[in-house]
């Protein structure tokens, strides 16, 4: 049962730290979107990259080791550079309640330094969420192995970990999309999560959500996913919720028995109790019966017909609660020649899910065919069409 109440002003300190080249690019994208209530930090071994950053705080890693020339794709150099700057990292993190770490895995600085940032954050008791990318397959096995090792090391310290495989950019968006728009789509995953959580904590809303609720959902939960969906019109609540849950750019994860769910609904003054219920029902479909579910709303007078849903799901792959899991059904998103059918994709998700299927696809087959059956959110389709 959900309780309605007033949200008092919050003073939780949220930082987003971009580590290395990939992480730096991600926070530049977020800075351009003018997110309130968040402080950005750019950390790198490359002094030239830091000189181009618009972050309020920049941190040069490994002055003595790299001389400002980068880590040379060597994670051990990135790790040593971060160790050299450990005291400065601690100084930057002190007083922070929640930190997002973002980096590209497989290179030198992000792979080697990110676990050091996470370790220091854990020592300080900071709620830590990492959002990282994995290399394209064509970059080779060695780089992928380096990325996997970095992700494993990061997982030892963070509370929640989200991975975005770059290869999904090819599968979901198609090979003809511009490189700029492809990486913009990946950066939007982090943008949506940070904006959704920051809005819940820092902006007044109708549902009483505070930082303690966020910590409960995300603390020591391991594998996680996050997504954002926006829709308008009669079925906007259901469509936005399902688009947020789809998250085709994220690493393949098993939703069954999710132990924590954080939802932010942002809409105008016309948000109805029925729409609130529709979002809740979409969440109920995959969460464990014993999961901690926190749903908050933010009223934005500037939003007229649009409704935005941000979903953060944690504790994935755990079957302890006996949740029903996500009902995986084949969704026909392609034409007979294998190309994307954009007319079909423009139909609401729930209508496509209700169409009869000629065969049943089990979980493993579904994962192998994620391109054919992927539910692609509207903002990604628009990028492809532009």
Curated annotation (Swiss-Prot):
InterPro entries: Cell_div_FtsZ, Cell_div_FtsZ_CS, FtsZ/CetZ, FtsZ_C, Tub_FtsZ_C, Tubulin/FtsZ-like_C, Tubulin/FtsZ_2-layer-sand-dom, Tubulin/FtsZ_GTPase_sf. It holds the Pfam family Tubulin. SUPFAM superfamilies: Tubulin C-terminal domain-like, Tubulin nucleotide-binding domain-like. Keywords: Cell cycle, Cell division, Cytoplasm, GTP-binding, Nucleotide-binding, Septation. GTP binds at residues 21-25, 108-110, 139, 143, 187. SMART domains: Tubulin, Tubulin_C. GO terms for cellular component: cell division site; cytoplasm. It is found in: Cytoplasm. One of its GO terms (biological process) is FtsZ-dependent cytokinesis. The keyword Transport does not apply. One of its GO terms (molecular function) is GTP binding. Gene3D superfamilies: Tubulin/FtsZ, C-terminal domain (3.30.1330.20), Tubulin/FtsZ, GTPase domain (3.40.50.1440). Belongs to the FtsZ family. HAMAP family: FtsZ (MF_00909). Homodimer. Polymerizes to form a dynamic ring structure in a strictly GTP-dependent manner. Interacts directly with several other division proteins. Essential cell division protein that forms a contractile ring structure (Z ring) at the future cell division site. The regulation of the ring assembly controls the timing and the location of cell division. One of the functions of the FtsZ ring is to recruit other cell division proteins to the septum to produce a new cell wall between the dividing cells. Binds GTP and shows GTPase activity. This is Cell division protein FtsZ. The gene is ftsZ.
């Amino acid at each position: 049962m959900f309780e309605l109440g007033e949200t008092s002003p919050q003073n939780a300190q949220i930082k987003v730290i971009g580590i290395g080249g990939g992480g730096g690019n991600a926070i530049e994208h977020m800075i351009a979107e003018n997110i309130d209530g968040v402080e950005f930090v750019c950390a790198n071994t490359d002094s030239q990259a830091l000189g181009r950053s618009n972050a309020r705080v920049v941190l040069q890693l490994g002055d003595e080791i790299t001389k400002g020339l980068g880590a040379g794709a060597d994670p051990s150099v990135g790790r040593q550079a971060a160790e050299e700057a450990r005291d400065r990292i601690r100084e930057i993190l002190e007083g922070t309640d929640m930190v997002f770490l973002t980096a590209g895995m497989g290179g030198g600085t992000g792979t080697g330094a990110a676990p050091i940032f996470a370790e220091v954050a854990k020592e300080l008791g900071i709620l830590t969420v990492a959002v990282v990318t994995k290399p394209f397959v064509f970059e080779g096995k060695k780089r992928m192995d380096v990325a996997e090792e970095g992700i494993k090391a990061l997982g030892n310290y963070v509370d929640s970990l989200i991975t975005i495989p770059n290869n999904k950019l090819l599968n979901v968006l198609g090979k003809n999309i511009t490189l700029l728009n492809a990486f913009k789509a990946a950066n939007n995953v982090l943008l949506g999560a940070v904006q959704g959580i920051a809005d819940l904590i820092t902006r007044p809303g109708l549902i009483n959500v505070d930082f303690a609720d966020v910590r409960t959902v995300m603390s020591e939960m391991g594998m996680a996913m996050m997504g954002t969906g926006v829709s308008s019109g009669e079925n906007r609540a259901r469509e936005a919720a399902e688009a947020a849950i789809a998250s085709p750019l994220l690493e393949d994860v098993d939703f069954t028995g999710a132990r924590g769910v954080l939802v932010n609904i942002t809409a105008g003054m016309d948000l109805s109790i029925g729409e609130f219920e529709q979002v809740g029902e979409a969440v109920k479909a995959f969460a464990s019966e014993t999961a901690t579910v926190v749903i908050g709303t933010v009223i934005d007078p500037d939003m007229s017909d649009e409704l935005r849903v941000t979903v953060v799901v944690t504790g994935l792959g755990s079957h302890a609660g006996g949740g029903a899991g996500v009902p995986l059904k084949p969704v026909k998103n392609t034409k007979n020649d294998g190309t994307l059918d954009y007319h079909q994709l423009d139909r609401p998700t729930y209508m496509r899910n209700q169409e009869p299927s000629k065969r049943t696809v089990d979980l493993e087959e579904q994962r192998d065919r994620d391109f054919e059956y992927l539910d692609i959110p509207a903002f990604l389709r628009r990028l492809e069409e532009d």
